[in-house]
From Swiss-Prot:
Its main location: mitochondrion. The modification N6-succinyllysine is found at residues 90, 158, 162, 199. One of its GO terms (cellular component) is nucleus. Acetylation at Lys-162 decreases ATP production. Deacetylated by SIRT3. In response to mitochondrial stress, the precursor protein is ubiquitinated by the SIFI complex in the cytoplasm before mitochondrial import, leading to its degradation. Within the SIFI complex, UBR4 initiates ubiquitin chain that are further elongated or branched by KCMF1. Belongs to the ATPase delta chain family. Component of the ATP synthase complex composed at least of ATP5F1A/subunit alpha, ATP5F1B/subunit beta, ATP5MC1/subunit c (homooctomer), MT-ATP6/subunit a, MT-ATP8/subunit 8, ATP5ME/subunit e, ATP5MF/subunit f, ATP5MG/subunit g, ATP5MK/subunit k, ATP5MJ/subunit j, ATP5F1C/subunit gamma, ATP5F1D/subunit delta, ATP5F1E/subunit epsilon, ATP5PF/subunit F6, ATP5PB/subunit b, ATP5PD/subunit d, ATP5PO/subunit OSCP. Subunit OSCP, of the mitochondrial membrane ATP synthase complex (F(1)F(0) ATP synthase or Complex V) that produces ATP from ADP in the presence of a proton gradient across the membrane which is generated by electron transport complexes of the respiratory chain. ATP synthase complex consist of a soluble F(1) head domain - the catalytic core - and a membrane F(1) domain - the membrane proton channel. These two domains are linked by a central stalk rotating inside the F(1) region and a stationary peripheral stalk. This is ATP synthase peripheral stalk subunit OSCP, mitochondrial. One of its GO terms (biological process) is cellular response to cAMP.
């Protein structure tokens, strides 16, 4: 019984992707494929926005949508499963009009509301952000240390990490702190992972000592 529902969703998403661009236009594939319901909506939106050269504008609007939906008053209304769908659509129309969102973003929100998928909005925003990050050639990198790193250390670290990037790629560094690692750092860049924490070194030492005994 699930197949017709999935098929119906696919048709609706395809209709959305072509509703704001010329008919029969070829689908623009995003630079990375995101699976699931959120990925389908995000892919359709990416295709439509790309054809209108409004990727950056839509990205900013989606981040604003995510911010608005986190407001307690708005969330209690449009994300409440007991509130009638027509009321949700009316509330969202008021919001999109006030924010002056583009037809692309407005159509997406309306489609999510009509399909009862507003709870997936944050996932759609996240999927679209992932596509845009790859579109810009950004390589995500997370550096975790026991205490905040000094600016000089961060600057030197960035220089080293950038040397591993390919031409056209941009380093997107995020620094985090986790006192539990005791010292050193953990670096994750793209699909690579390097654990140089004191905690891990102690654990390795403990295992080595047990093997000797």
């Amino acid at each position: 019984m699930a197949a017709p529902a999935v098929s119906g969703l696919s048709r609706q998403v395809r209709c959305f992707s072509t509703s704001v661009v010329r008919p029969f236009a070829k689908l623009v594939r995003p630079p990375v494929q995101v699976y699931g319901i959120e990925g389908r909506y995000a892919t359709a939106l990416y295709s439509a926005a790309s054809k209108q050269n409004k990727l950056e504008q839509v990205e900013k609007e989606l981040l604003r949508v995510a911010q608005i939906l986190k407001e307690p008053k708005v969330a209690a209304s449009v994300l409440n499963p007991y509130v009638k769908r027509s009321i949700k659509v009316k509330s969202l129309n008021d919001i999109t009009a006030k924010e002056r969102f583009s037809p692309l973003t407005t159509n997406l929100i309306n489609l999510l509301a009509e399909n009862g998928r507003l709870s997936n909005t944050q996932g759609v925003v996240s999927a679209f952000s992932t596509m845009m990050s790859v579109h810009r050639g950004e390589v995500p990198c997370t550096v975790t240390s026991a205490s905040p790193l000094e600016e000089a250390t961060l600057s030197e670290l960035k220089t080293v990490l950038k040397s591993f990037l390919s031409q056209g790629q941009v380093l997107k560094l995020e620094a985090k702190t986790d006192p539990s690692i005791l010292g050193g750092m953990i670096v994750r860049i793209g699909e690579k992972y390097v654990d140089m924490s004191v905690k891990t070194k102690i654990q390795k030492l403990g295992r080595a000592m047990r093997e000797i005994v």
